Amino acid sequence: MTDTTTTPAAGFYGLGIAPKLLEALDKLGFKVPTPIQQKAIPVAAEGKDMVGIAQTGTGKTIAFAIPMIQQLAAKEGKGLVLVPTRELALQVAEVVKQFAPLLGMQAAVVIGGESLGRQRQELFRRPRIIIATPGR
């Protein structure tokens, strides 16, 4: 008989993700990585360049955000995520802001159509990750 029980985020364990991030994945309900996550996370975690294509809603943001956050936790530097639209920037920021604080990082969003003063204040806090659109 095969044991079908799983440990928290068991499917993510073999991908080299830090324990705090694994715990967060489990708490947020992510139990099994999607195909794009299975393929992308190990490659991105090694710091390699890649291109990933997948349908909307398949977890592409987690596929690049988790390795980026983990890399930044291990060394100095900053992360920049440039996306083409304000809406996508806000979506990416929502995901990044769920995970980055777990490893002591802040993220900021810099987009058009929002208060420049508020965005400037966020940047003065020296976030490690900036999510932005090219227009700003």
Listing of model-derived features with the role each one plays in the protein:
Residues 53, 69, 127-129:
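Short alpha-helix boundary/capping motifs
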Residues 2-53:
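Conserved pre-motif I regulatory segment
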Residues 1-10, 66-86:
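Long, low-complexity, intrinsically disordered polar/charged segments
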Residues 14, 19-30, 76-136:
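Conserved nucleic-acid-binding Ia/Ib motif block in the N-terminal RecA-like helicase ATPase lobe
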Residues 35, 63, 131:
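Short aromatic/basic micro-patch
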Residues 54-58:
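The conserved Walker
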Residues 38-50, 60-76, 87-90, 94-99:
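Walker A/P-loop NTP-binding motif
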